[in-house]
Amino acid sequence: MLKKDDVTPDFNELNLAQLSVEFDNIVGDRTLAINNSANLYTNAAREKFSISSLQYFISNLEITTTAGKVYVVNQDSSYFLISGADKATRFAKVRVPEGDYSKLKFTLGVDSLRSTMPLDKREGVLDPAYGGGHDLSGMYWGWNSGYIFFKFEGNADVISNDVNGDPTGKHQFKYHIGGFGGYSAPTLNNIKTVTMDLNPGGIAKVRTGRQSNIHVLVDLMKAFNGTNNFSIAAHPTVMFSDFSTKVAANLTEMFKHDHTEN
């Protein structure tokens, strides 16, 4: 906790301290629970559903001081894969200059530059083989040579058992949203930028020897109930299609700064 007489330090890009951004996944007014078949969620279309998997990329963090100075986190240290099944992954921890910060900006997804870099520049969670491939826990389309930015799966009884739903009879929905604009030819671009004003919930006071934590709520219900409302029954599977742009537009509405712990 900061002292009452805390003085804002001079901005010095060589004087770095730790900043944490916490992505707290919720579903409406409830905490996210994976495999919640005993206590289903209900969306605006009154469809009951459970969630079996959630993963998304956060990258390219950028923060702005109360005086207007912008600091871009070193890109090599600015890629995070948040997993709903692993609470330890909810923190994006970076090092930034000591100071008072009133704005946070980040990318939901993986930028086109990194997406097209040689494999030795895409390690860890960016390794295309990470997670065992697209059909398992992987976040990379081998057939499309691109990252899945947002992977959201679950089950809902409203999904039909035919080709318009889930022919396997498992009533499964899959939303795999990606697309960085294309390498050699233009394609879908679902990269999204989120900017947050930290003033209402409290600015981040980053100091050496302490950890400031920006607490962000991520409401998954907005994936269905955002600007582009849709039903699970009508769109049980969305991947690399035109409709993915509507889902992607909803995703930016999931993020809301709740408070900051200094």
What kind of region is each of these model predictions?
Residues 4-262:
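A short, solvent-exposed, low-complexity linear motif enriched for acidic/polar residues
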